[in-house]
Regions:
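Extracytoplasmic soluble-region selector
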Residues: 1-177
Length: 177
């Protein structure tokens, strides 16, 4: 009495909101890691709103703001193994990001950087924060930077990237003392 279990697929992405006319990349994971896109069949619930290519890149058509689409990934060798991911188009993209904060920090101290995100009404203004070197300074999803001992005397760059597919980002250099 042998029962075969379906591999559990999960689609991951950096966002669920993408500006109309822009794109985002999705990945499929199983318990054993990331699935090679060539082993998947990607489909869009509405090609008039957004298309998806064989690499998992979803491209929203222009003037689709407010509309949603469900992207499905199916394993080529097991059509019963599939996952879905809902995305919504925003009317306008992010046009600019500026970061404010202190340009120098002492080791073991923290500061919260502020990202001013500009865009017309309806833009998705959430950003992803990253550090150029997590051994020198870390940054949380809220922009909280902590200077680490290994970074003493170094300079680190903190980046705030728009998640809406606009490609907009801002960089902020901090000297660690």
């Amino acid at each position: 009495n042998v029962t075969s279990s379906q591999p559990k697929l999960t689609i991951t992405g950096t966002t669920r909101k993408v500006a109309a006319g822009k794109k985002t990349k999705l990945q499929v994971k199983t318990s054993s890691g990331v699935v090679n896109p060539s082993n998947l069949i990607w489909t869009s619930s509405n090609k008039k709103v957004a298309t998806v290519n064989s690499s998992g890149v979803v491209t929203f058509k222009k003037k689709t703001g407010g509309k949603s689409v469900v992207i499905t990934a199916t394993l080529k060798n097991n059509r019963n193994a599939k996952a879905t991911y809902k995305l919504t188009a925003t009317k306008n993209p992010v046009t600019k990001i500026t970061i404010s904060g202190k340009k120098t920090m002492k080791i073991n101290k923290s500061q919260r950087l502020k990202a001013k995100v500009s865009g017309k009404s309806g833009a998705y203004k959430t950003v992803k924060w990253t550090s150029s070197n997590n051994k020198y300074a870390t940054v949380t999803s809220k922009g909280q930077v902590k200077a680490l001992k290994a970074g003493k005397g170094k300079t680190v760059t903190i980046t705030a990237s728009a998640l809406d597919g606009s490609g907009k980002k801002a960089r902020f250099k901090i000297k660690l003392k």
